[in-house]
Amino acid sequence: MSKLFWAMLAFISRLPVPSRWSQGLDFEQYSRGIVMFPFIGLILGGVSGLIFILLQPWCGIPLAALFCILALALLTGGFHLDGLADTCDGIFSARRRERMLEIMRDSRLGTHGGLALIFVLLAKILVVSELALRGTPMLAALAAACAAGRGSAVLLMYRHRYAREEGLGNVFIGKVSGRQTCITLGLAVIVATVLLPGMQGLAAMVVTCAAIFILGQLLKRTLGGQTGDTLGAAIELGELIFLLALL
């Protein structure tokens, strides 16, 4: 199980993980690592939250919010943001399904993808600033948001099909069992409720799961399934929705 955790950490983040820690693990086994997603989100969000706490006394809330969101993007190598941009480029092209998938595979950034990145990053910075002004514990909020975003992404894997013939998303999409889905969501709920006591964390998690479930259904109807890009989009939007739900 520890090998699976390190493999997942290396897979969806840019944190340095020695290869020997996940040695001997086949790529096909990665689908079992979905239950680790909330914990990985907890780590990434925790680092982002610490950066906010350390910088806020020195440069104020707005700049601290900017740098903590920048740190989160760097920690993931922009992996999920790239998926968000590609998804928006494809979906909003208003082309046939096959052409949408081709556009999503194109490495060039389009207008819709650029607008999506600007909107999501700016929205995150603004909502983090507003939460801090309201006295929200930002270490807990950011850690819980990242756990919720990654945990809720399982809703785009369970009982969904892969929209392409091959790709990284094929490791998870359609390969996750109902038991793994329940465990992943349950762990994300536990993280959110422990870090944000009372109904605040639980309510934000419910809102996030509902929004991501609807997103998954809309993407399935439009693309005929999910891709690695749509998973990245779900994670980014899940984080933002969770933070907005805390307001």
Swiss-Prot record:
Catalytic activity: alpha-ribazole + adenosylcob(III)inamide-GDP = adenosylcob(III)alamin + GMP + H(+); alpha-ribazole 5'-phosphate + adenosylcob(III)inamide-GDP = adenosylcob(III)alamin 5'-phosphate + GMP + H(+)
Main EC class the enzyme belongs to: transferase
Tagged with keyword Transport: no
UniProtKB keywords: Cell inner membrane, Cell membrane, Cobalamin biosynthesis, Magnesium, Membrane, Transferase, Transmembrane, Transmembrane helix
Main location: membrane
Transmembrane segments: 34-54, 59-79, 113-133, 138-158, 187-207
UniProt pathway: Cofactor biosynthesis; adenosylcobalamin biosynthesis; adenosylcobalamin from cob(II)yrinate a,c-diamide: step 7/7
Membrane-related topology note: Multi-pass membrane protein
Enzyme Commission number(s) from the entry: 2.7.8.26
Single GO MF annotation: adenosylcobinamide-GDP ribazoletransferase activity
Subcellular location: Cell inner membrane
Gene Ontology cellular-component annotations: plasma membrane
Top-level taxon in the UniProt lineage: Bacteria
GO terms for biological process, alphabetical: cobalamin biosynthetic process
Transmembrane helix as UniProt keyword: yes
Cofactors named for this entry: Mg(2+)
NCBIfam families from the UniProt entry: cobS
PANTHER family from the UniProt entry: ADENOSYLCOBINAMIDE-GDP RIBAZOLETRANSFERASE
UniProt function note: Joins adenosylcobinamide-GDP and alpha-ribazole to generate adenosylcobalamin (Ado-cobalamin). Also synthesizes adenosylcobalamin 5'-phosphate from adenosylcobinamide-GDP and alpha-ribazole 5'-phosphate.
Protein family per UniProt: Belongs to the CobS family.
Protein name listed in UniProt: Adenosylcobinamide-GDP ribazoletransferase
Organism: Salmonella typhimurium (strain LT2 / SGSC1412 / ATCC 700720)
Gene name linked to the record: cobS
